Amino acid sequence: MRFHCLGIPHTVTSPEYVACAYTQKLLKFCKMMKSRGHTIIHYGHEDSDVVCDEHVTVTTNQDLEDAYGSYDWRKGFFKYCMRDYAYQAFYRNAKKEIAKRKEKNDFLLPFFGAGVREVCDVHKDLIVVEPGIGYGDNHWAQWKVFESYAIYHAYCGLKNVTQCHQKWYETVIPNYFDVDDFEYREKKSDYYLYIGRVYEGKGVHIAIDAAKKAGVKLKMAGQKADGYVVPDHVEYIGYADLETRKELMAGAKASFLPTLYVEPFGGVQVENLLSGTPTITTDWGAFAENNLHGVTGYRCRTMGDFVEAVNNIEKGKIKSEDCLKFGQNFSLEKVSLMYEKYFTDVLNVYTGKGWYSPSDPDLFDALTKQYP
């Protein structure tokens, strides 16, 4: 199979942009599916560092400078607009470059969803699949992959509870991680961790309050919202690059992820598991699927729950090896089988017997998970 993979116009497809989940999904997807022998053509920034058969430059450093000036995305949230100079350059060049390379039954993958739809709409002869959907609106492609059942069911809505209109090719495949990016460690240091965007939507104030009430040290890392004041008793590290994140997660006794919205996935939660680190989360969204209460961490509904979760961590009730074992369900090797099956099923609609095509026995068990 051949995949045309569209980059994110305001970033560079490289490990450096670890704060952008969309960029990291694209980066790892290319490596994951290239390892299965597929052809990967990546369209993105000139400094991209991605495993592929061909990288096609469609934006440059000058484009980003013209659009964003000297803005430092490491200190604040990403700044972009789909009408800005970088996006317009991306659209213009990607449309042209895809036209030079596309073949019948190629896949076109918009990893930034509607943010790059303008490119996809020009190439409607390709098989457009929205991969890893975790955004709340503007879904449009015929073929959709959601990153959790939580976001998929939210997309379906209550009306689908009473109607028999589910679409067979709207599927759920979780995010995927390179296990080599993390250090598994059983011996932990004396701190708890919050890593992610520093603003109230991610529940950072809950992590701060819970750590204070439980009497434990809290380290915090991530892009900070303008004007957000970090209390003196919290150690704020700022933006954490790949190596800093790796060390922080490996050393933490546990990580807080008290997201206040319905979390579409929460990749940091799985990254912690791969580091052997338990997670303390809210009890909704993808956490209900990926954080096994009492096994990989705890899911909480009250401040008392968050404090009790810390108390249990202090008593050693969660085993690092259990966290790792469940986290390995999200490895590149494991999730690649799910994507292989899905793309095969979709391609059968164009080249085979569609829904009635025989299943590949080697891919049929792709949904199987291992549990501690």
Residue ranges of model-derived segments:
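Catalytic cores of nucleotide-sugar-dependent glycosyltransferases that transfer UDP/GDP/TDP-activated
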Residues: 1-372
